[in-house]
């Protein structure tokens, strides 16, 4: 039985329009292969970290958190058109522990906030400052050392290797060998082995996985066409030129590196050294500074009572004031006992700023409209008692979860609010939520049809046969729409289109 292998260079769909592997199938496949751990190393981001971490641990697979970062050839602050085809290299970073994870987060964040130029880039100076707790691999053919070897700059490749050795030390930097069927890779492997012998840097085997199984290579090729806006018939398009970048078995990897067994053994050594535990479900809210002698709770109570009095004073017609006061006390007790007084004060402060600048704000939506405290503070404009709205749908002591208050601001002046919050709490405490766009069934058919050079009218006819229902999949559409299934069965080109678009 071969030594278990651990994939340390793996791209998922979070390598946007580059990786074709979904998290659930990846983890299930790794478990089926009886491999004890797996790393994700998506391009320039950590988007998949938390879902990958939780899913892998639930499946009994050790998750290794990493990233394939973009290394600027000079300073990350240099932002000018590159002299060659690109002005960055690739490098694999893996988090050993909590310190390494924090450093990885800092590096990736700096790439976006300071070094973004076509790609989120870092540089060696920044890497040197945040290398603790990280293991580095030399990367794919686009890594600095492999690139120099491809260019036959062997002395420069050794100098670059020594740079990384100085940054990470002899136990945390590895030369990355791959067996992917590419002629260039074979030449680079020989160069890496020479550097290994010259400098004593250990070797490690990876496979730069971009799709799950070998049979997915063609679908991945189409994904690259979608990324680059080209078609399958374009001879100048980006292509990988191999069908070997899949999640291989331990047996396949052992056979590929039978003359260098230490490269396989080192994958397990690295996996053992990666002991990161991510503390999940720990709420860390920004601190709202209240005027003395108030506490968070007492300040919220004071504002809420004053706000309710002002609201009720504007009320016309009969009014059950004791009912409002009881409801306010009940809500305040729940909010304060759950530790969310500061959260309400933060939201109140943001809304107060917007209104003071005459920035149009929404009246409130979602379950927060059921909170009398939110109404009293001016966060919402709906009286929940007038409409019999339940506070418990918003915040329930029997189901502890963070409150969620949606705030809507005028699109043209939204940035003013963001700037205010950033200045008040600090740039390192404010982030915007990302939304990932995905291809629905109809869009996937149209994109794949374009890539396959199928006439638009024909593709449009097929796409229109997909039922217009939320979350409709191509497999579901084939089962529900007889015309679509008949067309797929009678015309191989349509069947291929649907098969690829649904993969």
Model regions: which residues?
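Alpha-helical scaffold/interaction cores of sigma-54-like transcription cofactors
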Residues: 1-503
